[in-house]
Amino acid sequence: MGAEQSGDADHKHSDFSASVVPSPAKHRAKMDDIVVVAQGTQSLRNIHNDPDVIKLQEIPTFQPLLKGVLSGQTSPSTVCLEKLDSAQVLQLCVRYQDHLHQCAEAVAFDQNALVKRIKEMDLSVEALFSIMQERQKRYAKYAEQIQKVNEMSMILRRIQMGIDQTVPLMERLNNMLPESLFWMLPMEHITFALDCLSYAWIRCFLA
């Protein structure tokens, strides 16, 4: 009976081990994990014939004008600056001078045009001012003459009032005279004499 139990245990252990061992399909490696170490058919690149490398080699090396301003340098005073080519600097200065000269010529041309226009405007303003002055003088004379006319009208009204008051008095005086001193004049003659007197007085006033 013990032999049977041991036989059964061995049979169960073999069955369990057979069930635990994974199948070869589960241990199949993925394509990403495969590394090929064999030499391929592609030929090696020659860096000497590479166009990108050739272009990089054609770029000249250069340094900044002020090497001391670089962040990696701690003592810029010890760095010796490279000298610039005087011919190129002179050419740069000459071109800049030509540019400034052209700008100055353009500004001078515009300035001359503005000055000419300002002179023309000054002449126009002066001519207009002279015309306005002459017109103002003419109107001042007209105003003075109108003032004289107003004064003359007032004088004539006063003279007319004086004549109107004088004629009845002269008539009364003429009627009161005796016959020996009677000097009867027509009223038209008396009025005409007074008008002539007033006219002469007005001419003296206007002169």
Curated annotation (Swiss-Prot):
Membrane topology of the entry: Lipid-anchor
Matches recorded under Pfam families: LOH1CR12 (PF10158)
Stretches for region Disordered: 1-24
Locations listed in the record: Lysosome membrane
Ribonucleoprotein among keywords: no
Protein name: BLOC-1-related complex subunit 5
Entry annotated with the keyword Hydrolase: no
Family, per entry: Belongs to the BORCS5 family.
Example GO biological process: positive regulation of anterograde synaptic vesicle transport
InterPro entries according to UniProt: TBORCS5
Example of a GO cellular component annotation carried by this entry: BORC complex
Function field: As part of a BORC-like complex may play a role in lysosomes movement and localization at the cell periphery. Associated with the cytosolic face of lysosomes, this complex may couple lysosomes to microtubule plus-end-directed kinesin motor.
Keywords from the named record: Lipoprotein, Lysosome, Membrane
